[in-house]
């Protein structure tokens, strides 16, 4: 049993970044369970470069079905099946996304086999996570680990979720994944969690919270709460904005944070 929960940002980049890997985090819980949050197309390379082989993963949690969050799943599935001898890891998926993840995204490359057509659970141990359109829904995974999913607005008509990570009964981190600016969700996250990792686009308009919106929000909250916010999912021009984020900080790719 480890003393602390740890989070390493595997990638911090936006969907079109060429300097950073797709936004993704590797969480190591106190029982040793290693969870990858989202697996975009460049994330397997990011894991490799950080010294985390695919065989070190125990599970992957998916927050929504954009390619920069699921594009690396096919590689993981095929590697586990053909290189690691059919090893299955957990695939933790919000319940409304289980069917679209397979039917609309993954089956084109994973369905076919010499003997029969395959399904998602031929590659992963699929674990459905509870959701609620009215707020939060919690799923207990084992005696140590639980996840709370929060419905977010990212793209119209697309289901997307933020996730709260709980280890040994303690709220550890709120991870927004992708969402437009949502003052009420931020209020809740900063009240309930010691750390908040929030997506941040460096221009105004679009499908993510902008830096200007987040700066406007933090002007009205205590500095102690501002210090809890790490910004992620940013563009390649991020260096132009270093020192211009108030008390908030840009999450650094590859950096391990003790939660």
Curated annotation (Swiss-Prot):
SMART domains: Lactamase_B (SM00849). SUPFAM superfamilies: Metallo-hydrolase/oxidoreductase. One of its GO terms (molecular function) is 3'-tRNA processing endoribonuclease activity. Pfam families: Anti-Pycsar_Apyc1. Its cofactor is Zn(2+). Homodimer. Residues 21-233 are annotated as: Beta-lactamase-like. Belongs to the anti-Pycsar protein Apyc1 family. Zn(2+) 2 binds at residues 64, 66, 154. Counteracts the host Pycsar antiviral defense system. Phosphodiesterase that enables metal-dependent hydrolysis of host cyclic nucleotide Pycsar defense signals such as cCMP and cUMP. It catalyses: 3',5'-cyclic CMP + H2O = CMP + H(+); 3',5'-cyclic UMP + H2O = UMP + H(+). One of its GO terms (biological process) is symbiont-mediated suppression of host innate immune response. This is Anti-Pycsar protein Apyc1.
């Amino acid at each position: 049993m480890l003393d602390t929960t740890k989070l390493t940002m595997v990638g911090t980049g936006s969907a079109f970044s060429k300097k950073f890997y797709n936004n993704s985090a590797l969480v190591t819980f106190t029982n040793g369970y290693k969870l990858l949050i989202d697996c975009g197309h460049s994330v397997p390379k990011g894991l490799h470069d950080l010294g985390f082989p695919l065989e070190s993963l125990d599970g992957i949690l998916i927050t929504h079905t954009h390619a920069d969050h699921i594009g690396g799943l096919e590689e993981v599935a095929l590697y586990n099946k053909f290189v690691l001898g059919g090893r299955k890891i957990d695939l933790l998926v919000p319940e409304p996304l289980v069917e679209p993840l397979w039917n609309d995204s993954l089956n084109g490359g994973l369905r076919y086999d010499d003997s029969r057509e395959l399904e998602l659970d031929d590659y992963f141990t699929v674990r459905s996570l509870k959701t609620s359109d009215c707020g939060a829904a919690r799923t207990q995974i084992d005696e140590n680990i639980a996840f709370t999913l929060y419905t977010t607005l990212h793209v119209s008509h697309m289901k997307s979720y933020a996730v709260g990570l709980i280890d040994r009964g303690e709220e550890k981190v709120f991870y927004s994944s992708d969402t437009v600016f949502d003052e009420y969700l931020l209020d809740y996250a900063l009240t309930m969690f010691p750390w908040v990792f929030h997506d941040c686009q460096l221009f105004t308009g679009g499908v993510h919270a902008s830096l200007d919106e987040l700066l406007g929000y933090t002007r009205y909250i205590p500095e102690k709460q501002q210090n809890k916010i790490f910004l992620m999912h940013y563009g390649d021009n991020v260096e132009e904005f270093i020192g211009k984020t108030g008390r908030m900080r840009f999450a650094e790719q590859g950096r391990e944070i003790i939660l």
